[in-house]
Amino acid sequence: QMCIRDRGTGGVSLFALQFAKMVGARAMVISGSEEKMQRARDLGADEVLNYRENPEWGKQVREFSGGEGIDHIVEVGGPETLPQSLRAIRPGGTISMIGVLSGPEMKAQLGLIVTRQVRLQGITVGHRDGFEAMCRGIQASGIKPVVDRVLPFDKLLEAMELLPQGRHFGKICLEF
């Protein structure tokens, strides 16, 4: 099974990359930064793709999969990136929507969703059993979250201002 992280250099996407590699999946990371793509390779990404240089990246992603399409896409971009994810997904594949960085509303491309029988699933915190299973996997594999920086709690406003800039690689954490 192959996974893809869309705009994949934030904390959630990098954690998903680590989980994909833990279970033996081939994984691709899409980013707009050469430096971040190299760091994703260092974390185990099998392939990286620059969405700034390849705005129609769905086609290149299909090539990565041998032309069949990706089994599972972790979609954090939202309406601006979902159309390319729909081009990249294999028939019957799953797109897990875990973020909407480009906004909460879009014109849906129902034709691709229906004809490719795509499973589009929203992801939130989840349930306790899933959380416990995730924790067991983390413990067994030694996965560590990628932390870009840790700020004291009194720098909360600064941390919130850093997030939309997208310059971080991994999580921005607050220390209490």
Predicted regions located by residue number:
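C-terminal capping/lid region of NAD(P)-dependent oxidoreductase domains
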Residues: G67, G142-V146, L157-F176
